[in-house]
Regions:
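Short amphipathic
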Residues: 79-85, 277
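Assembly/oligomerization interface modules of large self-assembling protein complexes
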Residues: 2-81, 290
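Alpha-helical scaffold segments that mediate packing/assembly in large oligomeric complexes
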Residues: 84-168, 293-298
């Protein structure tokens, strides 16, 4: 059983393993792209363009094959969530301690998951919403831009985004949508039968189908209430495997009983205890042309 002493908690595997999976899969980026195994620190990811195969006639000579390599730097970014509670939470008996740990893990997980989206989409610190200078190359920087027109059906802007991605030689198989944009698709019905036009589309983060796209819905796409400057993004469309990311290190749960770990005052003075969890993501975007942004600036 875990003991509420200062330091990292030893959490049973049946508790920590599913929680770590939720951390990795609780964001739109993680849902639509493939994570890479990573070690801690800055690294590189390569993509190769080898062109097409060459036909060789009988007795003919073979020509040279060219390989164009593109290198993308992957940088580590650490996020934490620290929660304070009255120290009475430490007095729980052993059976209740596991319940307390599970409740705390459940509180922390969504914030750490969403941090990946805020970094990859917007290059911002989720606390305060300010742009982080070290985070560069986020999807918001793509030059493939589509202006949403309220008078149009929502699939008009989606089709336009698809066309931009296709023109750059990529497959627009994925879309991350803000809930307000997603709701417009969900509301579309056949004028005669009143059946939904997209019956397999769901309004959650989990993958569903939207007009032939793998779709994930999250308010991290626009970041309302988080971003210091509203980008008015409604969706990111493209091939999300251009995002090279992974979890470099994760710390399950740490109990802090002394000091001032978050600037909120001395724990002992206020009869409090802090629980902290941290995750280090590594990410980089191989090619921003693989993605188009739909926004509503007008």
């Amino acid at each position: 059983m875990p003991a509420f002493a200062t330091g990292s908690l030893t959490i049973p595997k049946q508790k920590i393993a599913p929680w770590l999976d939720k951390i990795k899969n609780g964001s739109a980026v993680a849902t639509l792209s493939t994570p890479m195994p990573m070690t801690f620190g800055e690294g590189e990811s390569w993509t190769f363009d080898i062109g097409e195969a060459e036909y060789v006639a009988e007795g003919g000579a073979k020509g040279a094959s060219t390989v164009t390599a593109t290198t993308k730097t992957i940088k580590p970014f650490k996020f934490h969530k620290t929660l304070r509670f009255n120290e009475e939470v430490l007095w729980a008996d052993e059976d209740r301690q596991l319940e307390v740990i599970q409740e705390i893990l459940d509180l922390i997980q969504p914030a750490l998951s969403r941090a990946l989206d805020f970094g990859v989409f917007h290059e911002v610190n989720p606390t305060g919403g300010a742009v982080v200078a070290a985070m560069t190359g986020g999807l918001t920087g793509t030059t493939n831009l589509v202006e949403y027109v309220a008078a149009d059906k929502p699939y008009v802007s989606l089709d336009a985004a698809d066309a931009l991605v296709l023109a750059d030689g990529f497959n627009p198989r994925d879309i991350a949508l803000d809930p307000t944009y997603a709701a417009k698709f969900s509301a579309l019905r056949n004028a005669t039968t009143e059946q939904k036009l997209y019956p397999d589309f769901r309004l959650g983060t989990e993958v569903s189908d939207l007009d032939g796209h793998r779709a994930s819905v999250s308010n991290t796409v626009r970041g309302s209430g988080v971003l210091a400057v509203d980008t008015k993004a409604l969706g990111f469309v493209g091939n999300f495997d251009t995002i090279r990311w992974g979890v470099q290190k994760s710390i399950g749960l740490e109990v802090i009983r002394y000091g001032d770990p978050d600037g909120g005052g001395d724990l002992k003075r206020y009869n409090q205890v802090a629980f902290r969890s941290e995750v280090v993501y590594g990410w980089g975007v191989a090619d921003l042309n693989a993605v188009a942004k739909i926004h509503d600036l007008v």
